[in-house]
């Protein structure tokens, strides 16, 4: 079972992601802030992180930069309510980008794609 870290300041989004992604067979751990996410990262190993770009008084990009430095092997998907960032995610060294919506099909597909790619790297 893959462990996912979901970082979003909106409680309803964290709940939605937890419910939907748990149904897909993932273990989902959530955090509402960079501080909380950092604590969760110190407590365990994660296979992938899903980060909201705009957190309350913080930026998911800051956490992404921290993850790139400290956990360069952990894939990260950025999420935003705005599609304008879609062309920038690779420059930020993220592995994927998803526009937030009530339908999590795109997010689920992106998670599956990235985790399959990660497994493929390990088996080569």
Kindly give the residue locations of the regions a language model identified.
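Acidic catalytic/metal-coordinating carboxylates
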Residues: 33, 59-62
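Short amphipathic alpha-helix used as the core "switch/output" element in two-component signaling
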Residues: 61-72
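Charged docking surfaces used in two-component/phosphorelay signaling
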Residues: 15-23
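Alpha4 helix (beta4-alpha4-beta5 surface) of REC/receiver domains from two-component response regulators
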Residues: 62, 82-100, 105-109
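Acidic, metal-coordinating helix/loop segments flanking the phosphotransfer/catalytic sites
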Residues: 30-48
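Active-site residues of response regulator receiver
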Residues: 52
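The feature encodes the CheY-like receiver
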Residues: 14, 56
């Amino acid at each position: 079972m893959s462990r996912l870290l979901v970082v979003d300041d909106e409680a309803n989004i964290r709940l939605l992601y937890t419910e939907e992604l748990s149904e897909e067979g993932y273990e989902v751990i959530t955090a509402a802030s960079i501080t909380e996410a950092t604590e969760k990262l110190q407590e365990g190993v994660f296979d992938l992180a899903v980060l909201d770009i705009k957190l309350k008084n913080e930026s998911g990009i800051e956490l992404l930069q921290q993850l790139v430095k400290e956990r360069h092997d952990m894939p990260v998907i950025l999420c935003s309510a705005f599609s304008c960032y879609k062309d920038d995610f690779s420059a930020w060294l993220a592995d994927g980008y998803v526009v937030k919506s009530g339908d999590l099909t795109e997010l689920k597909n992106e998670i599956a794609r990235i985790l399959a790619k990660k497994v493929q790297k390990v088996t080569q």
